[in-house]
């Protein structure tokens, strides 16, 4: 098979990148690419470790003059998001990608490219392969299944690592240094409720037309949470009309801002017009409040089929109080990085069925103690309402370091090479760096990478010139880490 990237510079980087594109390596299909990395290390006499998950660690001694320098972790992930167009003939279990070079970009015909994070692996292999690149002792870590929940990093044996400085090459915008990320957890609330026979009329209350979005990346857009709006309407109705709740539901994922929610109410037939007026008044309020962020919000109350069971009024009150009091939205902004959401909570899933209230909130914070504070508040509310909290899916924060020698050194290298100051950023979502920081006390870490466009889609492409500049930066960074 002829090589498509052989004329591109840096030759070693693009050589290894093309090798990787010939090995199927979608998430949960990483054995072959993991074995490739192990064979690479053994052929060069390097120390190598491979675990049952297919994570790989390769160690290389320091070059001359760097023997006394602290070791450095160079990290990326082996898996890619495997997506293709309907007409693509590629079989991701056995076929190589069909690479294309157009102008300044490398892409794959009809499929994702896997630049996220194949370019990190290719750069690390090129460093390991070279006898000319100056560097401290290296601990190269290739994790797996990052794209489906960072499963490889979650199961990594961190006792194999001694370094406390780390270069993560898993960012998609050149010139941006990511230096912090949120930790998170899912807060699962369960509250038992009491039902009783019911002979009242029923109405269906719906809140819809919202935009929704990702609860980490878009929590700062000011968009409404349908579950919270549902609670406000129920409270407004309850203040003037006696009703009993039959059921309620809103949201499908805890990490998505719900764009719709509904509830079935049991009430007297003669109260139906007044309840409809209250719903209309709430809609008017919401449209005013969210005119800029969520202008499509609608609230409707329509007749529904009769039911023979409903929550008691006391149980209904507990549900309404939960929706009014549960933490939601931005809890704190960062004092270190302007514009960064530091702590937030999103009630992504809410159900009342079979006399049980079930709610799942996504809790995020780049400060571990604040994440615990929010979980404690949800726990306290749950207990006050006769329920319980179960925390799942917890992952650690990568907390911002006000003093970071590594960040300072890398910024100096970047400025020296480009004449520009790197942009320092943090994200309100989880990264593998957070798992490393949680397991390696004192870790000083920076994430960077070349320009990748439309990752995780069949339009994905990687800038050749940006790879060249990022490679030059990586070499300069390794050279600068002499102390």
Please give the residue ranges for each predicted region.
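Active-site-adjacent substrate-binding region
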Residues: 223-248, 400-443
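Fold-level recognition of mixed alpha/beta catalytic cores in primary-metabolism enzymes, strongest
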Residues: 136-226, 234, 238
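Zn-dependent metallopeptidase/amidohydrolase metal-coordination segment
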Residues: 13, 335, 342-357, 362, ...
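A short beta-alpha structural unit
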Residues: 18-22, 264, 298-310, 348-350, ...
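A conserved active-site cap/scaffold subdomain adjacent to cofactor or substrate pockets
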Residues: 254-333
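His/Asp/Glu-rich mid-to-C-terminal helical/loop segments that flank catalytic regions of hydrolases
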Residues: 159, 223-240, 269-274, 318-324, ...
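Acidic/His- and Gly-rich active-site-bordering loop/insert found
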Residues: 3-105
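Active-site metal-coordination/substrate-binding segment of hydrolases
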Residues: 66-164, 186, 190, 199-202, ...
């Amino acid at each position: 098979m002829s090589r498509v990237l052989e004329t591109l510079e840096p030759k070693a980087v693009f050589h290894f990148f093309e090798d990787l594109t010939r090995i199927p390596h979608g998430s949960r299909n990483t054995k072959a690419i993991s074995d490739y990395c192990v064979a690479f290390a053994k052929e060069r006499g390097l120390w190598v470790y491979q675990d049952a998950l297919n994570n790989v660690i390769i160690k290389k001694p320091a070059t001359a003059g760097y023997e006394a320098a602290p070791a450095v972790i160079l990290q990326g992930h082996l898996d890619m998001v495997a997506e293709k167009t309907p007409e693509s003939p590629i079989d991701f279990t056995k076929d190589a990608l069909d690479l294309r070079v157009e102008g300044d970009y490398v892409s794959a015909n009809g499929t994702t490219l896997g630049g996220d994070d194949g370019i990190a692996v290719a750069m690390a292999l090129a460093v390991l392969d070279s006898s000319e690149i100056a560097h401290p002792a290296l601990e190269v870590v290739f994790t797996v299944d990052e794209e489906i929940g960072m499963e490889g990093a979650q199961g990594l044996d961190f006792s194999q690592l001694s370094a406390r400085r780390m270069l993560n090459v898993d960012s998609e915008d050149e010139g941006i240094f990511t230096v912090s990320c949120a930790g998170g957890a899912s807060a699962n609330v369960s509250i038992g409720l009491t039902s009783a026979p019911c002979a009242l009329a029923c109405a269906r209350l719906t809140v819809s037309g919202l935009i929704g979005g990702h609860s980490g990346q878009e929590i700062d857009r000011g968009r409404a949470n349908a579950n919270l709006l549902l609670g406000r309407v129920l409270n407004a109705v309850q203040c003037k009309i006696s009703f009993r709740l039959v059921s309620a539901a809103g949201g499908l994922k805890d990490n998505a801002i719900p764009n719709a929610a509904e509830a079935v109410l049991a009430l007297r037939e003669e109260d139906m017009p007044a309840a409809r007026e209250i719903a209309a008044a709430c809609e008017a309020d919401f449209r005013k409040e969210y005119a800029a962020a969520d202008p499509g919000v609608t609230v409707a109350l329509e007749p529904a089929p009769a039911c023979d069971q409903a929550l008691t009024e006391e149980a209904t009150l507990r549900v309404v109080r939960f929706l009014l009091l549960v933490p939601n939205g931005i809890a704190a902004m960062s004092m270190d990085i302007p514009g960064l959401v530091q702590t937030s909570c999103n009630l992504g899933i809410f159900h009342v069925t079979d006399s049980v209230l079930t709610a799942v909130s996504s809790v995020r914070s780049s400060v571990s103690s604040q994440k615990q504070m929010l979980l404690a508040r949800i726990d306290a509310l749950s207990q006050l309402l006769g329920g319980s909290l179960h925390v799942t899916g917890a992952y650690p924060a990568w907390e911002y370091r006000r003093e970071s020698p590594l960040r300072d050194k890398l910024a100096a290298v970047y400025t020296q090479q480009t004449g520009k100051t790197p942009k320092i950023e943090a994200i309100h979502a989880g990264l593998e760096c957070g798992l490393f920081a949680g397991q390696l006390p004192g870790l000083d870490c920076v994430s960077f990478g070349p320009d990748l466009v439309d990752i995780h889609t069949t339009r994905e492409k990687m800038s050749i010139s940006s790879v060249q500049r990022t490679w030059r930066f990586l070499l300069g960074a390794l050279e600068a880490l002499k102390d």
